[in-house]
């Protein structure tokens, strides 16, 4: 309605039958309405468009290990985990591309285990739909929200609390990995990356850098899908591209993570205890190595604190 009023006044101002005094008065009125309209629109979108400073993309290892609400509570960092099971790197690229239409993250965390996904890549249309499915809360109250919320895949999917918690999947079940880190046998060999993976990875790096978004490679503990050969090739890429790489499978003393109580399924995914340790370290790392703002005292971000308190009460 306000937009309609602005258009109506603009039409009136361009009416040649109006005298200059009347035009001047209406011009002042128009500027006031424009100012109010823009401020209201900006305030409404402030917590949505360009509000995420850290965007994380990956597979189920990511959404099980990184808790954006803990990052908020401990560091005041706004983040989102856009992840899906067995996520193909082509979909990772689509997630980044779609999110950049409404967000300007300062840091992009790439969970690197999905670089080795061997299933066939989806086409552009399929990847776009999946990208919006795994990141749709980032589009709420933005200029694209009407488009995204009406997608059939959004309407028919029961996301539970997964998206409500900024992409984090909370699970406090415990099933120990008795073999600990035995899967990480040192070797000089390298796992091969598919040509398709290399192409999409280069596109992701190029796109992120075009938007001045710094990249961080991360691999969370996973005894079923990670090896030293994979570590070696990602470490090579890290050095070649000058992208930092944190591998919690080799840097086992960075946290207090323990395979006895930190996994929900014997070593494939982390549980809430494991995620707490990973997120705590990453929050401190992000705070030390990147210029990220602490929004905890900013009243415009009070919704984040309310959401954290809601999460904290439900998990306890």
Feature map (PLM): residue ranges:
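Membrane/wall-proximal cationic-aromatic binding patches
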Residues: 4-77, 88-95
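Acidic/glycine-enriched edge-of-secondary-structure segments
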Residues: 17-28, 78-86, 178-195
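Extracytoplasmic/secreted proteins, especially bacterial periplasmic and envelope-associated proteins
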Residues: 70, 91-95, 107, 133-146, ...
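Second-shell loop/turn segments in exported
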Residues: 56-57, 81-85, 188-194, 219-224, ...
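Histidine-centered active-site loop/cap adjacent to the catalytic His
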Residues: 263-304
């Amino acid at each position: 309605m306000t937009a309609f009023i602005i258009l109506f006044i603009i039409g009136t101002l361009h009416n040649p039958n109006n005298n200059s005094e009347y035009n001047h008065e209406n011009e002042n009125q128009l500027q006031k309405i424009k100012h109010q309209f823009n401020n209201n629109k900006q305030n409404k979108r402030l917590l949505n468009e360009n509000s995420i400073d850290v965007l994380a993309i990956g597979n189920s290892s990511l959404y099980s290990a990184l808790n954006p609400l803990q990052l908020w509570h401990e560091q005041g960092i706004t983040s989102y985990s856009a992840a899906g099971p067995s996520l193909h790197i082509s979909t990772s690229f689509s997630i980044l591309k779609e999110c950049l239409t409404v967000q300007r993250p300062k840091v992009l965390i790439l969970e690197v285990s999905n670089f080795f996904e061997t299933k066939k890549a989806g086409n552009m249309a399929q990847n776009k739909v999946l990208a919006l499915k795994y990141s749709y809360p980032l589009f709420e109250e933005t200029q694209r929200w009407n488009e995204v919320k009406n997608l059939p895949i959004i309407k028919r999917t029961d996301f539970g609390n997964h998206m409500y918690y900024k992409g984090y999947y909370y699970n406090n079940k415990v099933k120990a990995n008795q073999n600990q880190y035995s899967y990480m046998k040192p070797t000089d060999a390298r796992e091969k990356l598919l040509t398709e993976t290399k192409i999409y990875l280069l596109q992701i790096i190029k796109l992120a850098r075009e938007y001045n978004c710094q990249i961080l490679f991360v691999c969370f503990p996973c005894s079923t899908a990670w090896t030293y050969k994979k570590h070696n090739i990602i470490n090579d890429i890290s050095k070649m591209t000058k992208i930092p790489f944190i591998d919690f499978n080799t840097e086992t003393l960075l946290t207090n993570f323990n395979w006895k109580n930190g996994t929900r399924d014997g070593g494939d995914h982390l549980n809430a205890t494991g995620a707490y340790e990973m997120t705590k370290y990453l929050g401190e790392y992000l705070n030390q190595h990147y210029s990220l703002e602490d929004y905890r005292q900013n009243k415009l971000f009070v919704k984040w604190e309310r959401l954290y308190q809601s999460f904290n009460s439900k998990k306890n």
